[in-house]
């Protein structure tokens, strides 16, 4: 832990009571090289009990565990197709007491790369790819309703504390710029407070070209997006 070669701190999370942690683990074996079957294991903090596989029923990838603030729910991301590492991650909620799981937003076709619960556990804040960008979204845990909070670029990382979010956002014209804002007043990036300068502000003598997004119909009548 973390998993190789691309694992990180989001591969594991501590339970709020500090007595255990949950980690995304792929058990070594003959098929480990091509398998995508990562499971979530509950691990006793004192090592007095054997690890328990919480997601044995899913033969695909389970990742990114995080507890609700009260410890009653374990949120995580899960793929459904074994061996297909480009599968969509679904947002999942597991009742810690019963082990029952459900998909939070089954109608949402985006694949979140990170998630963090709100202070009361009623919502998840996630970053997910969306037509060439990585916006920040709010997902209602009860209804699955999805709201885009920050667009116009890619949110590479974020942290939520109470009503405040701090995030790093980049675009084709600039590397990461740090912003903060209130979660109650965000809307497509409005009301963000810029903390660090953009590339243009750092390099006033450099001309950064403009860009725009375009789309066209591709194979299977699918919409293909690009930049020019």
Each model region followed by its residue ranges:
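Short loop/turn segments that connect beta-strands within beta-propeller blades
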Residues: 44-48, 95-99, 140-144, 183-186
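Short, ordered coil/turn segments that flank beta-strands lining enzyme active or ligand-binding pockets
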Residues: 16, 46-47, 69, 97, ...
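Short coil/turn segments that connect the beta-strands within blades of beta-propeller domains
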Residues: 17-19, 70-72, 120-122, 163
